[in-house]
């Protein structure tokens, strides 16, 4: 596909979140794709003066290439709603819910989507006792890209209970989500334009699909399509579409899973749905789009077109909805 007119697009990237460097890579990839298609691009590195910079640029649309706070948690979405500027990806309410892993569970689990159990814990309490039986996972409530994730096992060198001086997310975050560790395989499915594209299996060479494994070339093998039974592929696509719909995502999203293949269908669990998935050359959404026959440039333009269509369908300047 190709947009029927040339646009002025602000690509919003960077910022101050842990995922700044990833966002810069995503944003630059998007900007080059748009320029290749003849669009005018203004690159803006997110800072406290971003509203004034966007107003001065006066774009047709903003491509939100930010990851993490404040570009993924509803802050930027609310600002752009108030400014009356069309923007890509999900809206304010969806972003607020999806970045919070506990709020996401409250939306998805009652509607039949399986997610790991667990609970919110105070980091200070970890130095007294484990919140769950080992092995378990500790992760920030409001971060993506496996930032700050720790797997606590009997063999880990964190101590038992965890030592105060042991390096881990408890040193950076006051609150963490503790979940049982699910043995098995890492799977993911992207949704673009209401279609679940494929299922990819991620095989990190480090043994865990962490931040470095995600964004360092050669650290993770991507198997697309995944070598999994047809019924698991169908379930992954079904859950990705349902999560996209229930949360009110738009444009694109990516749902991540752990699958204990010894448990069959019962071993598949949704970990999270990402409303701002990466758009770097290593990223999973472009990879699955290519598998589905969509070029990188077509993918970027499709996301922009979805944003413009949504904005045109709105009534008023601030939709305030989850779509």
Curated annotation (Swiss-Prot):
Chain sites annotated for binding Mg(2+) 2 = 272, 274
Which reaction equations make up its catalytic activity?
2 D-alanine + ATP = D-alanyl-D-alanine + ADP + phosphate + H(+)
Q: Which InterPro entries match?
A: ATP-grasp (IPR011761), ATP_grasp_subdomain_1 (IPR013815), D-Ala_lig_Van_CS (IPR000291), D_ala_D_ala (IPR005905), Dala_Dala_lig_C (IPR011095), Dala_Dala_lig_N (IPR011127), PreATP-grasp_dom_sf (IPR016185)
Q: Where is the ATP-grasp domain?
A: 105-305
Principal localisation:
cytoplasm
Superkingdom, taxonomy of origin: Bacteria
Q: Which residues bind Mg(2+) 1?
A: 256, 272
The EC number of this protein is 6.3.2.4
Binding-site residues, ATP: 131-188
Write one Gene Ontology MF term. metal ion binding
- Part of which pathway? Cell wall biogenesis; peptidoglycan biosynthesis
Task: From the Swiss-Prot or TrEMBL record, give the protein name.
Answer: D-alanine--D-alanine ligase
Organism of origin:
Erythrobacter litoralis (strain HTCC2594)
- What are the top taxonomic ranks of the organism? Bacteria, Pseudomonadati, Pseudomonadota, Alphaproteobacteria, Sphingomonadales
- Gene designation: ddl
